[in-house]
Structure formats: C-alpha cells, structure tokens
Amino acid sequence: MSRILLRGIQCHACRQNVIRSFVSASGVTITPPAIGSVSPSKAHPPHLSGSFPTRHVKLFSSQAKDDPSLAADAVSENSAAQEGSYPQENSEQHVPWYLQEEVQEMALHPMRQQQELPPLPENPPPILKVLLEYISFDIGLDNLNLLDLRTLDPPPALGANLIMIFGTARSVKHLNVSADKFCRWLRTTYKLRPDADGLLGRNELKIKLRRKARRARLVKRAGSTLKQPDDGITTGWICVDVGIVEGGQLSKPEGVQKAGFVGFGTVIQGTRIVVQMMTEEKREEIDLESLWRQTLEKNSMDNPGLPKPQAEEPPQVVGFTHESSTVTAADFSHRVSQTPPIRANYEQLRSISTSLHRLRDKRGSATDFVPTDTTVATKSAKSISSQESLPSLFNYLSNLEPDKAIDELGQGMDDRTSTSFLQRFYEELARTAPQIASAQKLELMCTGILLQHSGYRKEDLFQAFKEHIVSNYPLPRALVLRLLDALLAFKPDPNSNPPRLRLPGADMELALRLIENAALRGTNILHADFLIRVFLAVSYRTRVYAVKPENLHSAAITGNRIPVSIDEFESVQRIQTRLASIIRAAKVALGEKEYLDILRVHSDQGEYAKFWNAWGEVALAGIHRGKSFYLFLFNLHAELGDWQQSRTTLLNCIPMMWREDPPVFFDAELAEVVSKCIALAYPDIDDTVQHNLPALIVKTWHHCRTAIQNQKMNERKERLIQTELGTLPEN
C-alpha cells in the first residue's frame, strides 16, 4: 500500500484523492466543489478561457463541407467585415457580452508558474537551455532560478565564469533520485564528469538506512531516544558541479587586467555550471540566492565598469486582478471582469515560494494577505493605516473574555452597526484592497465560529470562501489552516439524545472540499498541519468504549467512558488506520504537539497497544520526551481513574524518565501529578509506605513529597522577603 500511495501523491491533482480516500469507510459522500454556482451579486464570475467569434460558429454548422453555400457565406462575411470598417449609423448597436472579443490573455495557473524556465543570460553556453529544460521537465524541479556569476572579480571558489542554477525538489527522496538521474544523463549524453556533493550512492544509501533501522530498534528496546537525529542521510541539499562546458565566455575589454598581476596556470576557456538542488525547507532556511545576490551587488560597487545586477523586488503573489469594465450598465452583471496577469521576472517567482513563507513567520497571520494588484503599492497613507488597524482590532478581540467577545460580534454576519467593534471593523474594511477585505472578512467569520457564536455559521463561511476563490484572490497557507480550524470546530455533548461525540458529516464534507480547493491552488496538503487535523476531526472527542448495537441503550457510563456502537467504533478505527498509512507512506514529519494529540485520541478510545506504540515512535523520531510528555502521561492516567493502568504506567515509565537523554527529574509540578497517580494506584500509600510495596514506588513517593515541600518552603521564603521589602502587606 505504501508503494501505491507514494506513486499517487507525486502530483497535486491526485493528492486530494488520497485525503478523501478514507471517507468511503464512514459513508460520507464528497461532491466536487460547485464554485461556479455563486451568484453574480455575491461574487465575481469566473474568468472565461477565451472568445468565441462568429467565424468559429460556422465551423460547427450542420452543413456539409462541400456545400457551395459555405463559400458564399465566407464571401459575404468578408464583405461585411470590410463594410464594418467604415462608420455607419448602426455602429453603436448593442453587442452581447458573449460575442465580445477578449484581447487579454488568461493568467497561468500557479502550478504552471512554478515550472517556468528562467530567462537566459547574455551570451549563454549552448548547453544551458537544454540543461534547464531537462531539469524542469524531465526530473521535475520547481521554482528554477539562474544567477549569472561570470562577472565576479575575483572569481568564486567554485571557479571562474560560473553560472549557478537553483531548483526545489518535492521531497528528500525526489531530491536524491533527481540528482542521481541528472548525473547519469550528463555522463551518457555529453560525456561530462559531474561531481554531486551530498549525493549518496545507491548501495551507500541502503547501508546507511539498514544501520539507522538497527539503531532505532535498539533505542526502542532500551526506551531511550536517538542521540543524533541528523544521521547525514536527509541533508536536503545536493550541489551538482556539472563542470566546464564550451562557450559562454563574456567578452572583456582590453586592459582590464590590473598592472602588476602575478599568477600561474592557463586561463580556462569555457563556463562552469553548478546546479543547487534543495528541498523547499532547506531552500528557505539557507536562502542561498540572497547571499550570492549580495555578493554580486558588492562586486558591482567595487567594479564600476561591470553591469549592476537586477535588484530583487519585494515578494508578491502573482494572481488575477480586476479592472473596471467599459461595457454599459445594462450588461455589467453579465460581463466577466478582465484579469490580466502580472508580469514578474524570475527572481519574483523564486520569492513567491520561499520569501513569502519567511516573511509570514515574522509578521504573523495578520499580514499574510498580500495584495495582488500592482496599483495597491501606490495606495494613500489612509489606506495603509487601515491595514495596520485591522490586526489591532483582532488583537483587541482576542484579549477579551469569550462572553464579551461574543457580545462585540453583534447578532451575526448581517450585523454591522450594533457594536463599536463592528462599526470600526467595517469602516476600515471599506478602505482596504478587495483581496485584503475578503481575507479579513473570512477571519472575522472564523473568529465567530470558534467562539461558538450562534450568528456565524459554517455554511456561510464556506460560501464566503467560494466567493474568495472565484475572485482569484490569494490563498495563503495560514488562511487555509484558519478556515480548516473553524470548519472542524466541534464541542461534544454527551447529555444529548443521542450523544454528540463526533464531528457531523456535513462539517467534515465542507472541510474536505476546502482541502481539495487548497490542493488545487498549490498548497501541500500532505503535511502534519492538515493530516493531524483531519485525524482529530474523525475521532471521538471524549472517552468512549464499544458495545453491541442491541446493548447500546442499556449500557451505562463506566470509568468516565461513554458507550458507543461497535459498528461506528470500527468505522472510526478504519479511517484512522488509513490516515496513519498515509502519514507513514508520505513520511510526514510529526512534532511534539502532533504526537500528544495522537496519544490522547488512542487513550480516549481505550487503544492502549496503539498508545504505547505511538509513545515509542516519539523516541524513534528523535524527539526528546521531556517534562511535557511525562506531565501529559501521568495527568492522563490520573484523569482516567483506572488504578491498573496507573500502576502499570508508574512501574514502567518512572525508570524510563531517568534514562532519557537528558534525564527528567522531579519538580513540584511533576511531583504533584505523579503523587496523584500513586494515590490512585495505591490508595493506602500513607499508612503502608514501608510495608509490602515495591521499593520503586516508595522511593518515588518520598521524592515527590520532598519536591513539593521544597517548593512550598521556597514560596514561603519569597513571601517573607517581599513582606520585609514592603512589596506585600502583612496578613
């Protein structure tokens, strides 16, 4: 199954099928998104692909090809065209919108823009164009960038007459396969000897993987963590030195060489090409293009005679922009708005895939909504100040208590004047660009849904999202995750009849359609941010246990667990198993928060075997199981109230704490939680602490009591010191 999944997830068009594959087990039917069903009064109609003139209509006529009337029609059409070139009385006759010619080209799809080739530099080597086409089309690297370093003086360490190409691989496996295939192609086609730094040979990779698996088994058996997570296999960066190729030398004027130049060797005729292959994360991390561009700028300042490199423009999202239509008011509602593409150089395309994510982390989610129209850059100061005030309004709302925040949101989406917050929000919204206004409106609806405001519904949020998509506004990753959190928001109600313990199927359908649209817009949905959210959404939101359907009405709540039908319980398990298979097959990297969520789900469902398997996978992933993990573990068992599970956990996990690297020792917070588990597993611990109990439990109990007493003594000392200094009144 892993091989099939890996083969199917290589393109964005197939990824949404992987996410939706688990829905068949639950019976939820997902229909394709009907984006075009949005009314024109609420959203802009989609951009048409092209015009349909009258000369094309005759090609679909029912007459035969050899009909002589066709020639007559053609002659009459030509004569009519010639007559139409002169002004006539009926020249202002109304022309329907569907017969009007569209002169502007349709913008490229965002995925197509990632595969565009960069422009060739001046006097390129003959092999350069073929090299770029092979890198983009055959091995599938995206977001290609080309830097011409032939003007550097002195030349870089890689050699003189250097041209450097940058490309992004989809994964670490794709990176290694692409580099190996590229080197073999150069050897067989051009008889070159490329040097790939960072590429492991096929046999060497197998040996390292076997050694890593052997170490992982030993670590899991010992109950510890891997000391060196970076094993040198997944570097995420391969530098391929193609070598020196013919042609491409820049013509230097005579007398450029400085007087008194001393050196040896011969001047090499040709151009050296280096290809930097990286994963998207590594490319964002090191930002090698910016470093070389700074070197070029410094070189141009030191050598005034050399051409200056083109300055990198600030990153922007290339998308559709809306212009005012020139048609009459009668058919304005029928005319599709013209959407010319923004022409961007290749450096801007590189910034789209990397710099935007980097700026997003620094500025936060409030500034993720970057305008697409180039005219927005020349807005007035009043409009710019409104963009800065909108995030401040959301910050004000987030600092309020939930009840007060709900009151500030008014009656619902149609309410715009009942509170001062709504009045200020819509006043600022009217002065912003349409792209930002649409995104901020979605943010407001998400806030209302997450606060469980009755006036903000998920159906209205998804309708506003469709209008946002139809208008071709940018869809940042942070906005997608925010929308997904709102659609998957759910509060269980065990007291209802029947109990509401899982997310309704209608809400799950909306969330999956959102993920599908995000995948078609180029978002990587095979990521922990998406998969874990879906995993939690299909799971139960409280502690449950399975019973037969005929015994469901008579079953009682036992041990804080609510009875559910075994058929529904097994359906949830099948969905979770499919999602876990997708995570393993796609090699999705999980973090501490994701593992804690998975552990809680398995504990709520009473799947203790899966719980301890996931606990061991944390160590195999190279994540340190520190204080937060053991606080979660002992708190979970204390809330569960099962003395047998608490006793087993104490005997197994307390020695494991001391074997962690670094070890986890008791402090007051951890000691308090462990004491609760000991009191649950051994109720008479105070009376029989010296009799008939394992030595480990007695030792741990004394450690916990000592840590708690020390904490109380320290707090008492601090209070006395503050009282003496006069900072606190004496009681």
Swiss-Prot record:
A GO CC annotation given for this chain: mitochondrial inner membrane
Keywords: Membrane, Mitochondrion, Mitochondrion inner membrane, Transit peptide
Keyword set includes Signal: no
Top-level taxon of the source organism: Eukaryota
Topology class, membrane: Peripheral membrane protein
BP GO annotations: mitochondrial gene expression; mRNA stabilization
Region Disordered, residue ranges: 68-93
Protein location: Mitochondrion inner membrane
UniProt transit peptide range: 1-29
Family recorded in the similarity comment: Belongs to the ATP25 family.
Role description: Probable mitochondrial mRNA stabilization factor.
Name of the protein this chain belongs to: ATPase synthesis protein 25, mitochondrial
Species, as recorded: Paracoccidioides brasiliensis (strain Pb03)
